[in-house]
Amino acid sequence: RALLKARLLDIMIGDFDRHRDQWRWAKFPEKELWQPIPDDRDQAFCRYEGLVLALARPRVPILQNYSDHYPGMEGLTWNGRDQDRQLLAGLERPVWKEVAQELKSQITDEAIEKAAHRMPPEYFKIDGARLIHDLKGRRDRLVAGAEAFYEYIADKVKVYLTDGPEYVEVKRLDNGDTLVQVWRQGEDGKPTGEPFFRRTLHKGETQEVQIYLEGGNDRVVTLGKPNSITVRVIGGRGHAVVDDTKGGGTRLSDTGSGELLPGPGSHLDRQPYTPPLPPKNASWIPPRDWGRDILFVPWLSYGSDLGALIGGGIDTQAFGFRKEPYSSRHIIRAAWATAESTFRADYKAEFRFENRGVYVGWYAFASGVEASHFFGFGNETGDGGNQNSDVFKSRQLQYGFTPSVFIPIAKDLTFSLGPTIKYGSSQHKQDLALINLQRPYGYGDFGEVGGTGTLELDTRVEASKAPGGMAFRSLGYPRGGAEVRVTGQVWPKAWDVLETFGSVEGRAAAYLTPGGDKAPTLALRAGGKKVFGNYPYFEAAYLGGGLGGFGPSAGDEPVRGLQRHRYAGDAAIYGNADLRIYISQFHIFLPGSWGILGFGDVGRVYYSLETSTKWHAGYGGGLWFAWLDRANTLSVSYGRSEGHNGIYARAGFAF
């Protein structure tokens, strides 16, 4: 109760930074329990105001804006999440309301006004009245704030035992609730004295209770039929006996000598568990296995081929027990391409299993930009000096769906395999368009069904964080590591496919940074594609310079300055080199850094009905800007190839 009272004061004054190191604990002779002593309240009354911070708040919820109302509890309590869920687990809702009401009655108007007037007079003139108003508002809403806090940590309850022998009883009640009680265990294996932990978990509030046995020879007994509240028992260093014969449905995770006496639906998992690396500055915090994050994701870019691609979507992640980095994830986006007056939408999903590396997912899309141009087949097709002419436009709507199984082979190496279905519908408005005149195989409505397999190695990191600290993956500005991806597809004779064909495509990129934050980065990439058999035109190996493909196996097209799909053939090969140089720091709304970049590209296609030795080259440069962190990078560049120009703006870089 003393800790809860202190935490309620924390949320009332808006101090979000209440991590474990900001508490002291004292033992008084007249009290059996250690008493909490709050320390270093240095983030109270913070007002992170402004449009930019409001946009950043969903991703960084601790950027609180103090007012007379309580914000979401995640940001307000995030830094103390491990301690809250461990030490407040034994308190039920009535206790929270009672302690909140007690604290509310002690914080009088007089106390608030007196405290505010202790500020320097000059500062009180600026903000004193607003601070008094906000404090009184939060004080008046303290009971509601306490209930929101309670509900936030009640979804998954964690019960930690000690290193001594304990007796745990889990009783599922007829009304759907679950009663958990913990006693000291006597020499006869029976409970002794009064329970030192007792809590009734209510359906609709709690999804799961996790009982951590720690050391000692503990005994857990379950009673009653399983209900909506999942019961997990996590074995410790001692020998535990979990008697589920009178209950059922209990899940025991124990890599030691634990024993499960099973009931209906019981499950024992003895597979070793290796948790992910914890935060470098908070190594005691366990992996997140509760709650859900829902974020807005913008989808913004510009290329001379598509114009502005404007849109966005949501990225939602749910977290579960020993399902890392999340139990499920859904990314749903849609965008409009202004130059082509068409759209693209996609949906990527992942589903993880408990304490297993293998996971499943799918990728689905609907798009009018996948096959936007057609110049014919060959490495030397002409464009009449105008690669942007409507003659070369190829309007096709494509729909695709690929469910996959993902199998980790080694650290950072994953293999995925699954069926693929794709359907295209041509919508050509220009009668004199080249594709209307040639009508290649695949023209019109075309459906295909096949299989896709991908092998991916990804060790990209933000080099400035290594070796001094834990490196993290940064796709916005990779400065170290490498990425290798190889994808194979087979399309058998079925639907509109006249004969079986297939393809293999791959790319490899490496990032070299000889130094720290201000050192330049040399990014190198090589790749290609080979198509086998008689294939529809939109499955050809293309070489172009647009913003590139968008699917999970697609990379940016590799010769900047060219039009999308400028050259098509049976095979394509390319190479890219980018030099990204830091110039200086800046402060526009938020602190950041900026620099310049230069690039050179080269590539060609091969076509069975043509003999060509020509290579297509592109070159250019631009600027990059990074706010707060290099992961938040925006690049703007200009490319030129064969007398044609391209302008590109995007999050991150081309690769």
For each predicted feature, which ranges?
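Conserved kinase catalytic-core helix
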Residues: 2-18
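Catalytic-loop signature of eukaryotic-like protein kinases
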Residues: 15, 20-27
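C-terminal catalytic region of ATP-dependent kinase domains
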Residues: 26-198, 203-208, 216, 222-230, ...
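Outer-membrane beta-barrel initiation region
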Residues: 49, 212, 222-223, 234, ...
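C-terminal outer-membrane beta-barrel translocator/porin domains of Gram-negative envelope proteins
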Residues: 282-294, 341-350, 362-394, 399-404, ...
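Membrane-embedded beta-strand positions of outer-membrane beta-barrel proteins
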Residues: 298, 330-334, 360-364, 415-419, ...
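C-terminal beta-signal and adjacent terminal beta-strands/loops
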Residues: 598-613, 629
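Outer-membrane beta-barrel "beta-signal"
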Residues: 623-625, 644-655
